[in-house]
Amino acid sequence: MIILLASSLHARGVYQTDKDFLDEVFDNAPPKSKKIMLVGKLRKSVEKILEHPYGSLRIRYWKKDETTAWILEEIGKVEPITFGVEIKDNQIQDIRVLEFREIRGWEVRYPAFRKQFEGASFDGMKLDREVDGISGATLSVWAMTSIAELSLFLDEYVKNK
């Protein structure tokens, strides 16, 4: 019982702060954040990707040259998971778990799993590839996949507006 409690406590936590993520993406010189409002068709498209309403009316992002960074949240089983996504030239360069609040599914933070998303692009309303799951972390895998799709969609949206 103590081992189970210790492993669930180990899973929760801040793995990287928003600031540290942005500093890493933009070589310690992140640009000012920009915002998009989720209204009308955009909101409906976001809801279609996530299969539920997004929890906010505004989404912040950071853009410098061809690189865009997104810090987004999605529910795992019960609690939100905070992800950082770096996109360059319409492809995911990196996706990270910044903060994990669940008791299961934390394995999605490992580089071996995240590597599947490197180079991924948007094909219609989905990723251009299948993502292998992790036994016992299905909902966290779905959350990360949804955020990957959402960030690519939003990246395309801000480039075309």
Regions found by a protein language model. Give the residues of each.
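Flexible, solvent-exposed loop/hinge segments and secondary-structure transition points
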Residues: 11-131, 138-142, 146-161
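Bacterial N-terminal signal peptides
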Residues: 1-7
